[in-house]
Amino acid sequence: MKISVFNGPNLNALGTREPGIYGADTLADIEAACRTTAADLGVDLDFLQTNQEGALVDAFHAARDTSDGVVINAGAYTHTSIALRDAISATELPTVELHLSNTHAREAFRHHSMIAPVCVGLILGFGAYGYPLAVTALVQHLKQGNAP
């Protein structure tokens, strides 16, 4: 089983960008934690971080042939990207939406997700720990044959 983990805009700055909101862990720290979880679960992972919306869309299309599911922190594109929503829907890959912060406890514009309706689940507000949670949840979902 293979899971892709996609990270959107500004997530390359984790560890230094607003640590009071996003925590002190870097993206490399998060990837290491995910790899540990994946090894325990016996699954392979690949990672992508991009600040470009089109690159995320392309990544979903490529993942259709290489991955069993996707964990995505789409960052700000969560709230704006119909293109990303359409890519998730078109590829039919089981996808978990993830956010480090509780977006519903923040600014009103962060309360709506364009992608949540086409994702199998949502994890938010647990900081860096949300990533291993999302990987674990997606693997469990896939092992259950995509049952809710």
UniProtKB/Swiss-Prot annotation:
InterPro entries: DHquinase_II (IPR001874), DHquinase_II_sf (IPR036441). The active site is at 22 (proton acceptor), 99 (proton donor). One of its GO terms (biological process) is aromatic amino acid family biosynthetic process. Keywords: Amino-acid biosynthesis, Aromatic amino acid biosynthesis, Lyase. The record marks 17 as: Transition state stabilizer. GO terms for molecular function: 3-dehydroquinate dehydratase activity. It is an enzyme of class 4 (lyase). It catalyses: 3-dehydroquinate = 3-dehydroshikimate + H2O. Pathway: Metabolic intermediate biosynthesis; chorismate biosynthesis; chorismate from D-erythrose 4-phosphate and phosphoenolpyruvate: step 3/7. Its EC number is 4.2.1.10. Belongs to the type-II 3-dehydroquinase family. NCBIfam families: aroQ, PRK05395.1-2, PRK05395.1-3, PRK05395.1-4. Catalyzes a trans-dehydration via an enolate intermediate. This is 3-dehydroquinate dehydratase. It comes from Jannaschia sp. (strain CCS1). The lineage of its organism: Bacteria, Pseudomonadati, Pseudomonadota, Alphaproteobacteria, Rhodobacterales.
